[in-house]
Amino acid sequence: MLRTFLFVLLWTFAAPAPSIYDFTVKTIDGKEKSLSDYQGKVVLIVNVASECGYTPQYAELEKLYQKYRDKGFVILAFPSNDYGGQEPGSNADIKKFCTTTYGVTFELFEKIPTKGEKKHPLYAYLTSQATPSGEIGWNFEKFLISRDGRIVGRFKSGVNPMSADLTKAIEAELAKK
């Protein structure tokens, strides 16, 4: 009995910690995509909305993506209608808005809940594992993910994507091979 208990205890602590690579999501076009496809990349995950005061951050996110994409950096944007109902459109509407208004070329995913009981499992992971942990406060909150899938930074909505704080954190992660 003691041997079984010790085995289970050791196995529990020896199990690898989950990472974003353990999740599958749907693209804005409805196709399944494993986040393990981004292994080895530095990833910025952002919850976005089309009718928010922070919506102009799409332009800054695109600049950020263009600046670092050739160095192994990607942005994954997840529309959500959870904050003030500021993303009421369909996935097709969102895609059209982002590409025509802001010229977005980084990856867009289907609209998902990012808080509450119906929160998408990816966001349940992000909000419980990031430092600080806790619910997202508003649209355009950002999670920086290392090349090995760990959360290494969390940036509030008001942090401009081209800010020194965020770009330095991205550059530090890109420098790690």
Sequence positions of predicted segments:
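Sec-dependent N-terminal signal peptides
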Residues: 4-13
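N-terminal "domain-start" segment that seeds a small globular fold
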Residues: 13-36, 121
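Amphipathic alpha-helical repeat scaffolds
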Residues: 27, 47-51
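Local sequence-structure signature of Cys/Sec-based thiol-disulfide redox active-site neighborhoods
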Residues: 39-44
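Structural microenvironment flanking redox-active thiols in thiol-disulfide oxidoreductases
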Residues: 54-120
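Thiol-/selenol-based redox modules, centered on thioredoxin-like
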Residues: 121-177
